[in-house]
Amino acid sequence: MDTKFDDVLTGEQKLRNFNINFGPQHPAAHGVLRLVLELDGEVVERCDPHIGLLHRGTEKLMESRTYLQNLPYFDRLDYVAPMNQEHAWCLAIERLTGVAVPRRASLIRVLYSEIGRVLNHLLNVTTQAMDVGALTPPLWGFEEREKLMVFYERASGARLHAAYFRPGGVHQDLTPRLIEDIEEWAEHFPKVLDDLDELLTENRIFKQRNVDIGIISEKDILDWGFSGVMVRGSGFAWDLRRSQPYECYDEFDFQIPVGKNGDCYDRYLCRMEEMRQSTRIIQQCLAKLRVEKGDVLARGKLTPPPRGEMKTSMEALIHHFKLYTEGFHVPAGEVYAAVEAPKGEFGVYLVADGTNRPYRAKIRAPGFLHLQAIDYIAKGHLLADVSAIIGTLDVVFGEIDR
């Protein structure tokens, strides 16, 4: 007898896997992340990320805008630390045009790149703690982020979408008062990190949720193309600020924190230590900025003339008008410029055809490659561990979907 009620008669149940949607409206899903999870009981069998919910066609839009008009698009990629993305775009243009950035502008860029790193890691470490049940860290972390956002605003006029780094330098100089305030913040900040450390690092619950979860080996790093903390947490001391120094990073004294086990906990420890190292770089930057005065924009075809000059010189006025209507022309060629963004290696592959618009710009977002591997990393873990793994991948959908 072969009927559909056989299993009822024998008492044997046919087990089937359970499919659930994780996100896009889930408290632990970062932004518009959607995962389709296949569960066997509470064990993850398959984890399928669905991307594209924040796709805006950035790379295509960039082909119809001038180089300067494209700059603000980079703020909208990884919107947690916007200036780090602008940096890659400016470096790409400067390499093709052969423009040398003034010394003071270079120092300001390093300063704000490191402030961006602290902004990013503060958000990541504290929200990762919240994902696994600790509610205090986000409140403390956001208090510090607020101070840094104010520094962004005082430099560029905007808290988030700064458009402060420009091809040839930075938009405007920092005031002496702002430099003093950043210095004061940098003195007090390590105390905040110590408080966070005390709450989380040896916390039994936090360790149970993160130790030996989402382990990544050397082979995985090379297979999936990881970068940033995902690499350093597994014991590779790979940091573009050291291995391929750009701007003036080779002048600074800082260390690169490296993990041992490549699990969520080691990546958390790396991010905490990176914030301390960033604070060191910030303090060294400020000391140099006090001494080294000068221009913050390379005067030439890429940058506008000084205001005063425009009131007396017709040529300066014409240059200003042409720069903001037609934009500058970049010589034909191709270049790949990468920076060590907080999430990993953020790169721009720029192809120029000699006009005032890029022929093609390919954006290499680190988070995209990290999210690709979520199925591989999460397989065999429990459902509750998925949110810990996502927290430690550090994904932001502005740059993944772009």
UniProtKB/Swiss-Prot annotation:
| Gene that produces this protein | nuoD
Q: Which UniProt keywords apply?
A: Cell inner membrane, Cell membrane, Membrane, NAD, Quinone, Translocase, Transport, Ubiquinone
Function recorded in the entry: NDH-1 shuttles electrons from NADH, via FMN and iron-sulfur (Fe-S) centers, to quinones in the respiratory chain. The immediate electron acceptor for the enzyme in this species is believed to be ubiquinone. Couples the redox reaction to proton translocation (for every two electrons transferred, four hydrogen ions are translocated across the cytoplasmic membrane), and thus conserves the redox energy in a proton gradient.
Which is an annotated GO molecular function term of this record?
NAD binding
Subunit structure and binding partners: NDH-1 is composed of 14 different subunits. Subunits NuoB, C, D, E, F, and G constitute the peripheral sector of the complex.
Supply the NCBIfam families for this chain: NuoD (TIGR01962), PRK06075.1 (NF004739)
UniProt entry tagged with the keyword Hydrolase: no
- In which compartments does the protein localize? Cell inner membrane
Checking PANTHER family in the record gives: NADH DEHYDROGENASE [UBIQUINONE] IRON-SULFUR PROTEIN 2, MITOCHONDRIAL (PTHR11993:SF10), NADH-UBIQUINONE OXIDOREDUCTASE 49 KDA SUBUNIT (PTHR11993)
Q: Which domain of life is it from?
A: Bacteria
Q: Which family does the record claim for this protein?
A: Belongs to the complex I 49 kDa subunit family.
Going by the record, the broad EC class of this enzyme is translocase
- Membrane topology type, per the record? Peripheral membrane protein
Q: What is this protein called?
A: NADH-quinone oxidoreductase subunit D
Q: Cellular component per GO?
A: plasma membrane
Q: Where does it primarily localize?
A: membrane
What lineage is on file? Bacteria, Pseudomonadati, Pseudomonadota, Alphaproteobacteria, Rhodobacterales
Q: Does the keyword Translocase apply?
A: yes
Q: Pfam families this protein is in?
A: Complex1_49kDa
EC annotation? 7.1.1.-
User: Reaction catalysed?
Assistant: a quinone + NADH + 5 H(+)(in) = a quinol + NAD(+) + 4 H(+)(out)
